[in-house]
């Protein structure tokens, strides 16, 4: 397994690593990025909360490392402008797909 870091930067004053996502090393780069993106989004529950009984967004491959918000509210979804670290290279969530920090499409 390979560990990716999800870094929220789009709406924060400073970058914050919010999760580590374990992915199969044999996946392509785009598949790794898409997996990390999908499983740090709130679609059918809360990706960052483990205490919900019916939580379609829970995935044991995702480890939340940022604290929950006051009152136990979950973390926001990964959005355009956020970053995913694969190995030692960061990729940015783009309007469609992903880009390098230099703006090259993946």
Language model features: what each stretch is:
Residues 73-106:
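Short, compact, well-ordered microdomains
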Residues 4, 59-62, 103:
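Low-complexity, intrinsically disordered short peptide segments enriched in small/polar/basic residues
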């Amino acid at each position: 397994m390979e560990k990716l870091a999800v870094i929220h930067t789009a709406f924060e004053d400073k970058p914050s690593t919010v999760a580590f996502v374990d992915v199969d090393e044999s996946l392509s780069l785009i598949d790794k990025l898409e997996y990390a993106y999908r499983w740090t989004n709130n679609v059918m529950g809360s990706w960052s909360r483990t205490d919900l009984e019916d939580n379609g967004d829970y995935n044991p491959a995702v480890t939340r490392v940022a604290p929950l918000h006051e009152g136990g509210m979950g973390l926001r979804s990964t959005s355009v402008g956020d970053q995913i670290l694969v190995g030692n290279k960061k990729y940015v969530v783009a309007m469609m797909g992903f880009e390098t920090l230099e703006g090259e499409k993946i």
